[in-house]
């Protein structure tokens, strides 16, 4: 089952409160209090619902309500509490005596929220209180540097480096062009000829080395053959002498 309406729909007045209605509500609450908001309009003689009477009393008719604009300190407190509590307007109102949750919600959506959004869009971590931009830095010793000047400085450095690189390329090309003349090509030809001569010398040395190896091999072979020859000669003479000593018969 749904909740029963707080009052009968027929005959209930809506819209802004008149001063006479406000005075009737104030007098009744001063005399009897507000223990039961549902029954209060009927006992007070008001053609209003209980919810309307409660909101009218809490947000406008209470004697301890502060009147007038919010001070910069109150606005700063609302901003800080909203960062931690969010849209819990009743909890925020409990930290600000004399201010209602409805009033705090209205001032947040009409002034503070738009002001913070504008400051964030400008790119700064600033909090605008009473029309004054207060820049908050986590590091008190940090130095604020103009980003535009830094960008201009970096662009100038880049341009200088590029121009220097191009200048070096141009100078090197001119130097090479100045060096490439007839003497350069004659030097290249002489170097080429010298390389060919060196290659011929290397081939000649390799041929001599191979021939020397062959000669040494042939000489060693001839030497061995001579030794065998003379060995055979000596052994044959010795055999002849032995046979000559045998007596004749």
Swiss-Prot record:
Superkingdom: Eukaryota
Expressing tissues: Expressed in imbibed seeds, hypocotyls, cotyledons, roots, seedlings, siliques and flowers.
GO biological process, one term: response to freezing
Matches recorded under PROSITE patterns: HTH_MYB
Transmembrane portions of the chain: none
Motif Nuclear localization signal: where in chain: 198-205
Keywords, sorted A to Z: Activator, DNA-binding, Nucleus, Repeat, Transcription, Transcription regulation
SMART domains, A to Z: SANT
Null mutant phenotype: Increased tolerance to freezing stress and higher accumulation of CBF genes and downstream genes under cold treatment.
Chief location category: nucleus
Keyword Repeat attributed: yes
Pfam families for the chain: Myb_DNA-binding (PF00249)
Protein's UniProt keywords contain Acyltransferase: no
InterPro entries in the record: Homeodomain-like_sf (IPR009057), Myb_dom (IPR017930), Myb_TF_plants (IPR015495), SANT/Myb (IPR001005)
Subcellular location(s) of the protein: Nucleus
Cited function: Transcription activator that regulates freezing tolerance by affecting expression of CBF genes.
Protein name, entry field: Transcription factor MYB14
Organism: Arabidopsis thaliana
